[in-house]
């Protein structure tokens, strides 16, 4: 059964045929995504005071405090179904929302202002040279500790997790670089490889003071945007990137699957480290809850109450959350569109400007170099592109915006409820036809026409009375003419052998 769920206007969500929602509507469930963030062993690293000081200099002083975080795979999988890489936003019933730069700073404590993280891929020979020079030890290719310039996270932990008490400062720096490489490889730069991290990041920690001048938060968001975009394709079964950020973002904004809060402290991800982070709710239930989101379930500006916890140097950069700019992390280039989600800043949401289509095929090296150069130029001008509502204003439901949004988006994914509604609308049409047929004077028809009409009437009458649908149709008003796409409630007659359930079973078979 082909179901056209939209969008009515495909000019924005032009990749609908690739998106997982198209598979969901066809009943092709891919199941839960495999979440590739590996924080469970972070606590096994024993850092000395010297190492902690170097980690602070490198810009990860707050981030390292978060440590292991239990992930709710069902919730994450449901959120990914709402992500659209055409706009880098979640498409929810009340409009678009996204993870913005300021939220990276608040939730993770990472720097969102500074130099972009750029570089190029390295070969195996260069990677081994980097390990020898910056780590002081070499992984073994024979033992599969290194492959394609990527080292195993387990090798880093096994070799460097405890720095000798009598270590020289050079050895301390090597162990600290190994920890930082492990930290980013298991969190913000985690990949679908799962247990490996690229050595290309290692030179970023050669000078710890310089490392502290990078915009790690912007790079983390670029990687998460890319990971969400990839995972939103129906062909994918994994998701990587900083899933702690994704999950905490949801807890702050959406009253769905939230655990009990811990004591508030900075970074704000620590608020959600208490017991109960895992949930037994399945994907289909989260899908339904996201379909049913109403204003009471959304907190547009959740961080205002924590203002007294935010360090001054972090607070001074939060304005960049409203920067319409380009995020960079090595070869990854992603667009940051706060203008599509101004209600998250307490602003009125107008209809946003059209997003230019991205050509994701046949990316040549020279095209990538040109794009990277332009992206870095845009990032350098990030402070000049702070967006605001036309005329300012408070959060309001803008009728023009919601009317536009209804045309360009897809906000309902709970397929079972939609199909039941379609079945009930079909029954309403059958009821109308039966009533119309009953008003026809059969004596005016020829014998052959009369026989056909009586057969049709009997067929509709028998169908409607099967399972009690005649009474349901009358009492629920299903005989009334309805506008197209008008919501129809689903009756509950306590029986399992009715037309609706049989048709749904047939559709699922």
From Swiss-Prot:
Cell compartments where the protein resides: Nucleus
Region (Disordered) residue spans: 477-509
Higher taxonomy: Eukaryota, Viridiplantae, Streptophyta, Embryophyta, Tracheophyta
Encoding gene, per UniProt annotation: MAIL1
Pfam families assigned to the protein according to its UniProt record, in alphabetical order: PMD
Protein name: Protein MAIN-LIKE 1
GO CC terms in record: nucleus
Described purpose of this protein according to its UniProt entry: Acts as an important factor for cell fate determination and maintenance throughout plant development. Required for the organization of the root apical meristem (RAM) and the shoot apical meristem (SAM). Required to maintain genome stability and cell division activity in meristematic cells.
GO molecular function: transaminase activity
InterPro entries cross-referenced by the UniProt entry: AminoTfrase-like_pln_mobile (IPR019557), MAIN-like (IPR044824)
Keywords for the protein's UniProt record, in alphabetical order: Aminotransferase, Developmental protein, Growth regulation, Nucleus, Transferase
Tissue-level expression: Expressed in root tips, the shoot apical meristem (SAM), leaves, mature flowers and embryos.
Signal peptide: none
